[in-house]
Regions:
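Conserved N-terminal catalytic/coupling substructures associated with nucleotide/phosphate chemistry
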Residues: 2-128
Length: 128
């Protein structure tokens, strides 16, 4: 019987830590290695951001966060698909990244971390 309350407390602690981490990142604002995106609507457009991070020291995207730092939330499945398509299909060579979804203030925020690429330059393909 003691296990269940412990697990519930542990789960709520992890949620709080995750939420605090996202708030910490948002408080830093946008900078050379961090960008906020309200949503991802086009894999080709986001490929430019991914390639820019991959060509420098890497960086992170907080998707579901407005430019002013307000959390808007996202439907993560579509954004995850767009990031995957951008990194694998529209960046040459491909970009190494990781994604994690955080539940913050009742909304989903997708954190995408892009590693610096060993093979540079990374090009973002466009229609031309």
């Amino acid at each position: 019987m003691l296990i269940r309350p412990f697990l519930l407390t542990f789960a709520s602690m992890k949620r709080q830590e995750s939420s605090e981490y996202i708030h910490f990142l948002i408080a830093q604002g946008e900078h050379q290695q961090q960008d906020f995106k309200f949503e991802i609507s086009d894999a080709r457009k986001i490929a430019k951001t991914l390639s820019a991070f991959a060509n420098t020291d890497g960086g992170r995207l907080l998707i579901g966060v407005k430019d002013n730092g307000k959390i808007a939330g996202v439907a993560c499945e579509e954004e995850q698909y767009m990031i995957q398509a951008a990194a694998e299909q529209y960046c040459k060579p491909g970009v190494t990244y990781s994604m994690q979804t955080y539940f913050v203030n009742g909304k989903n925020v997708l954190l995408v971390e892009i590693a610096p690429n060993d093979k540079k330059p990374v090009y973002a393909q466009d229609d031309n």
